[in-house]
Amino acid sequence: MGGTIARNMSRAKRLLVVGALCLGLAFALNGCSQAPSQNAPESADGAAQTDQAAQNETRTFTDSAGRTVEVPAKIDRIAPAGHTATQVLLTMAPDKLVTISTELTADQAKYLGGDYANLPVTGAAFGAKGDLNKEAVAASGAQILIDTGEIKDGMKEDLDTMQQQLGIPVVVIETKMEDYGAAYEKLGELLGMEDRGKELSDYCKAAYDETVSVMSKIPE
């Protein structure tokens, strides 16, 4: 029995390595060259009115918890609900972030470039800390709060409660260590970035398959 437990622990550690590698490779592929979202002044009243009309349009989206949520048809301003969500969104749509969950280190800020280190730090909505700064999220002008991670019991109710408190849509995208590709495809659907989601999905799937193949040949 001890051997079985050890093998399971070894497999779990390997999956964690693969998941971390996938995110790292996605960061490298992205380059994070896009700047975070800024609300630039409109050059003409007509353009402003057109943009406002577009912002008011909505559609429905079914998140990974099975909740049907009314979301903006065009999403330009995102607040991540936690640290994993920040990492995933930095690879998927860095230009749309208006907050981050935790302060960046000097090395992270240098690597990412842009003004990410200057974005408001809003904490995490769920988990052990659950220290989301709701006032800062509201002040950021975020259109939506996006969480990522494992789908757990009671999550639907927690997400609904958070949505009521914030007054903006709150959705969750499941991220499994063995299938980050599916998360990127789901994000692509949500953000209207299907091509980008497919690109990152394919990249993660290829990286996962190759890494698992290599690690399977290493004696336990």
What are these regions (language model features)?
Residues 4-19:
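Bacterial N-terminal signal peptides that target proteins for export
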Residues 18-28:
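Bacterial N-terminal signal peptides
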Residues 28-47:
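Bacterial lipoprotein signal-peptidase II cleavage site
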Residues 41-60, 66:
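Post-signal peptide N-terminal segment of mature Sec-exported envelope proteins
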Residues 60, 68, 157-220:
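Extracytoplasmic substrate-binding proteins
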Residues 65-92:
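Conserved H-X4-D acyltransferase segment
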Residues 79-81, 98-101, 144-148, 170-174, ...:
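Structural recognition of the beta-strand scaffold that forms the well-ordered cores
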Residues 85-140, 144-151:
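A short, structured surface patch at a secondary-structure boundary
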